[in-house]
Regions:
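Proline-rich intrinsically disordered, low-complexity coils
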Residues: 11, 23-24, 49, 57, ...
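A ubiquitous short alpha-helical element
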Residues: 7-12, 46, 149-152
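Residues forming the flavin
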Residues: 1, 80-234
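Ferredoxin-type iron-sulfur electron-transfer modules in oxidoreductases and energy-metabolism complexes
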Residues: 1-2, 21-54, 70-97, 219-220
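Iron-sulfur cluster-binding cysteine motifs and their immediate structural context
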Residues: 7-32, 53-83, 129, 133-136, ...
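General structural signal for alpha-helix termini and helix-helix connectors
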Residues: 4-7, 44, 48, 62-66, ...
Length: 234
């Protein structure tokens, strides 16, 4: 697939990516067998390719010239996943230690935004503590996405790297704006949007009607081994 990338003069895939990923560059390195170089290019713009390589809506592929011309885009998302998995397998992904600047930041929320903010702040020398209100780190990555799309072991693997780099995670932390933890120089609020939007439609009040996120969160807990009483099961 990487060989199909044409390194377009006007790279629509690059423009379409909210992260500013550079598919032509990392796919060229991948095609040439330069996996470490591909990994370095990819992670230059993307903190967590193992997540996006599995669950991203792949706007890059929708903008690929081969998609527009013959409805057969380069499988950029799968190539991302292949690169990062090769990087873990070959040992390219190693915890790094950064020079500290003496400042500390509390990141509230451990979903995609919180993890990315923590990762970037840590790289810039801040002492980072991530607070998560639920019992596991990951936010909607963990509770809103089924295992067949994103195995929770993938999340745990990345969190382990971040912990080894000096980031602290605290779960079951019930925090609001009137109860921020003390002792930090700054706060980064990354609470996401977990509140579902209700619909005022006929039948909404019927038994057995639930928000999708409620069902997904409960099922992910069941798969993690938690016991849910029969009367509470969705």
């Amino acid at each position: 697939q990487a060989s199909r990338c044409m390194d377009c003069g006007v790279p629509f895939c690059h423009w379409a990516c909210p992260l500013g990923n550079r598919p032509p560059e990392f796919q060229d390195a991948m095609y040439k067998g330069k996996w470490k170089e591909a990994y370095e290019i990819l992670t230059g713009t993307n903190d967590f390719p193992e997540f996006t390589g599995r669950i991203c809506p792949a706007l890059c592929e929708k903008s690929c010239v081969l998609k527009l011309s013959m409805d057969a885009p380069v499988t950029i998302r799968e190539d991302e996943a292949a690169i990062i998995e090769a990087a873990f397998r070959e040992g390219y992904v190693q915890p790094r230690q950064y020079e500290r600047n003496g400042k500390s930041v509390a990141v509230i929320g451990s979903g995609p935004a919180g993890l990315a903010a923590a990762n970037q702040l840590n790289r810039r020398g801040y002492a980072v503590t991530v607070f998560e209100k639920l019992e596991y780190v990951g936010g909607l990555l963990r509770f809103g996405i089924p295992n067949f799309k994103l195995s929770k072991s993938v999340i745990d693997r990345r969190v382990a790297v971040m912990e080894a780099e000096g980031i602290t995670f605290k779960v079951n932390a019930d925090i609001d704006v009137t109860n921020l933890p003390e002792g930090f120089d700054a706060y980064c609020i990354c609470t996401g949007t977990p509140q579902a939007r209700d619909l005022n439609i006929p039948g909404r009040e019927l038994k057995g009607i639930h928000f999708a996120v409620e069902m997904l969160a409960q099922q992910n807990r069941v798969l993690a081994g938690q016991h849910i009483p029969e009367e509470e099961r969705i």
